[in-house]
Amino acid sequence: DEVKKSIFWMLFITIGLTLAAIFDGLNNQDMTEPKNHLLEFNPMKYNTYQKGQCTYYVFDKVREDHHQIANSWHDTKDWAKNAKKDQYKVNQHPKEGAILQTTEGKYGHVAYIEKVNDDQSLYVSEMNFKKPYEISNRTIPANDVDQYQYIHPKENQHIS
């Protein structure tokens, strides 16, 4: 009988914690217009890209800006194509906070645009341009800017 009670309470607590983890619950900070976040998924909550790679770094930079990109675009050589499929703006017009993308190399590469300089060169930050886990910065000369695609992250509507 004591074993059954213990099992019941462990199961009850486990289910409660699981539900709390699945649902962010109700956000009633603004009581004039309470917003229900049940079943609402924040695509930026978990970075599923491989640590130490350019994709992982760029995902985190976009998240810091309270913007969003998909966590399922795979190799960077496919990011522009996959972003277009997901209704993201992809073009050859760089902007601060956008993602520079190239198909060069075996897997391609992405970098985060920190600044568009007055001379139209780009100051970018990136990871794994030189080696895994290494964050570096460089300037893309203005005459090379048209060699890349630029993915423009969306506003993240899922943050409270």
Walk through the language-model features, giving the residues of each.
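Secreted/periplasmic proteins that engage bacterial cell-wall peptidoglycan
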Residues: 30-110, 126
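Structural motif
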Residues: 58, 116-118
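Aromatic- and glycine-rich peptidoglycan recognition patches
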Residues: 118-160
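N-terminal secretion targeting segments of exported proteins
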Residues: 1-39, 155-160
